[in-house]
Regions:
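Cytosolic juxtamembrane amphipathic/interface segments immediately preceding
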Residues: 5-18
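General structural signal for secondary-structure boundaries
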Residues: 16, 49, 110-111, 142
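Short, highly charged, low-complexity non-transmembrane loops/tails of multi-pass membrane proteins
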Residues: 140-152
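Hydrophobic cores of alpha-helical transmembrane segments in multi-pass integral membrane proteins
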Residues: 20-43, 48-79, 83-107, 114-137
Length: 152
């Protein structure tokens, strides 16, 4: 189920955004790991952690998420195009739940509710990241096929 034509693959591979994504996506994953670890340690009282660090962790995770999403808008203006629709919908849902954490914190929700909301935000990130990875694998297989056929 490839989505890219040979012309689109050439454009994608030449895009600055592709390079930015290759650098920032793993950094975002490490922020996710740190955030989910802190959230879990706090939620289960494994160690004494000030709730401030839960918010800082999701803040940095959200900032990297936003940088990746915004750079996709800036470089090549590909947001919500047919080729990237599901990735962008997934990113929008994940962004909503990441930002919802801060809205709920501002509204004064208790820490236990914010911990659950942080888990939901992290879960939407994982679902979104998994669908990205599946699509990348499919596209890499398609790209190999197109190279063998001489279309690239």
């Amino acid at each position: 189920m490839p989505r890219y034509t040979p012309e689109q693959l050439i454009k994608r591979n030449a895009s600055v955004w592709t390079d930015v994504q290759i650098i920032l996506a793993p950094i975002q994953f490490f922020f996710f790991l740190g955030g989910i670890t802190l959230n879990t340690l706090y939620a289960y009282h494994v160690v004494q952690i000030d709730f401030f660090w839960i918010s800082i962790a999701i803040l940095f995770k959200t900032l990297f998420f936003a940088i990746l999403f915004i750079t996709g808008m800036i470089f090549d203006h590909w947001v919500y195009t047919p080729e990237f629709l599901w990735e962008d919908i997934g990113s929008t849902v994940a962004a909503f739940f990441h930002l919802l954490y801060f809205v709920m914190a501002w509204m004064g929700y208790p820490e236990n509710v914010l911990v659950v909301e942080a888990y939901i935000a992290y879960m939407t990130y994982i679902i979104n990241a998994l669908q990205y990875l599946i699509r990348i694998i499919l596209e890499k297989n398609n790209e190999k096929k197109l190279r063998v056929q001489g279309h690239l």
